[in-house]
Amino acid sequence: MLETPKVLLKNLQDCKIHFIGIGGIGISGLAKYLKAQGAKISGSDIAISPSVKYLKALGVEINIPHDPKAINHQDVIIHSAIIKEDNTEIQRAKELEIPILSRKDALYSILKDKRVFSVCGAHGKSSITAMLSAICPAFGAIIGAHSKEFDSNVRESADMSLVFEADESDSSFLFSNPFCAIVPNTEPEHLEHYDHDLERFFFAYKYFLDHAQKRVIYKEDPFLKNYSKDAIVLEKKDIYNIQYILKDGEPYTSFELKNLGAFLVWGLGEHNATNASLAILSALDELNLEEIRNNLLNFKGIKKRFDILQKNNLILIDDYAHHPTEIGATLKSARIYANLLNTQEKIIVIWQAHKYSRLMDNLEEFKKCFLEHCDRLIILPVYSASEVKRDIDLKAHFKHYNPTFIDRVRKKGDFLELLVNDNVVETIEKGFVIGFGAGDITYQLRGEM
């Protein structure tokens, strides 16, 4: 199933690497990591993003937008999955016979000599990766989100061990060279990449697990409960005495795990305790138990995952959840947080569906996921993520919520403005608001667009 890429990155010191789509969270992580390894990095993207700004501040030359003139003397080109063959920079690289790698192919070269703790699953992988990197601070880390512990999606380290967030959406997790494969769940997602073939989808997970020396899995998952090879297994009954507290105003979950005693982790919800437990079990051979317990406290959450933007008259939370399962779990956390704050405010959800394909594939579950803990639903237009627009009658499908439909939301000081046709139709000055989506809703809620 896995073919070794024909082009391999060898000596990274002074290797000239150009990234097309450098602003994406996955590509920017590789760019930061390779720069720290001594490579000479350049890149391009269609727009300026926080990742682009960060890399520019490090001295990386970045073209906005893509420009074939940026391709000249590089040793290799690496592009994100979204970049097509007709991209002008790709075409120029072919003319100059510069080797071209997809991010997936580049991973093999970057990780092949590392001791990789590779985390993959439909939900929770960013959190688990960040938690494990907090527990094992000497390890390098490449995460698909910004860890608040070190304010980046990358932590550079000379250590051979690396915590890596792997991606099943394009099967690139198969290239991550897992020493330890950590899988919280295998709920089918991104099936278009697997030709909507569930057998092929689950075979990829089996291949990923089979080729690791060590495996840590959550046995409640329907696929993982039947996995037959040796693995460190977590079951729901292994986590008990779960409690939620505010510590210095921050939300925490305390829990006990197997016979290992009590742990405290930033964030709320049973899923948070599950994620932390998988990270803990993955680290048992690396550190003593007290080090694990203490280091877990360094985890302070990750950007866009139950990201509390403000907590005054208007409590505002930004969350990346874009699948019904994730939204349902995070809404439970929101209710717990509201109860801890002793607020009587109703929970207002602002939702931006991400991709027409995902919305259609999971429509019935989306129609149900707001039933609990959502007191008011506000719906933004679908964020297409470059997909062709499809006609979906959201008003009809979600009429049971009596939702409010808007074009965009705008942060104005400590308030939120709801806009239709560029006209403010409502201002939210107080209450409890949580935004869900993997598109540009995060920038709208932060007043960055």
Curated annotation (Swiss-Prot):
Pathway: Cell wall biogenesis; peptidoglycan biosynthesis. InterPro entries: Mur-like_cat_sf, Mur_ligase_C, Mur_ligase_C_dom_sf, Mur_ligase_cen, Mur_ligase_N, MurCDEF_pg_biosynth, UDP-N-AcMur_Ala_ligase_MurC. Pfam families: Mur_ligase, Mur_ligase_C, Mur_ligase_M. GO terms for cellular component: cytoplasm. ATP binds at G121, A122, H123, G124, K125, S126, S127. One of its GO terms (molecular function) is UDP-N-acetylmuramate-L-alanine ligase activity. Its EC number is 6.3.2.8. It catalyses: UDP-N-acetyl-alpha-D-muramate + L-alanine + ATP = UDP-N-acetyl-alpha-D-muramoyl-L-alanine + ADP + phosphate + H(+). GO terms for biological process: cell division; cell wall organization; peptidoglycan biosynthetic process; regulation of cell shape. It is found in: Cytoplasm. It is an enzyme of class 6 (ligase). Keywords: ATP-binding, Cell cycle, Cell division, Cell shape, Cell wall biogenesis/degradation, Cytoplasm, Ligase, Nucleotide-binding, Peptidoglycan synthesis. Belongs to the MurCDEF family. NCBIfam families: murC. Cell wall formation. PANTHER family: UDP-N-ACETYLMURAMATE--L-ALANINE LIGASE, UDP-N-ACETYLMURAMATE--L-ALANINE LIGASE-RELATED. This is UDP-N-acetylmuramate--L-alanine ligase. The gene is murC.
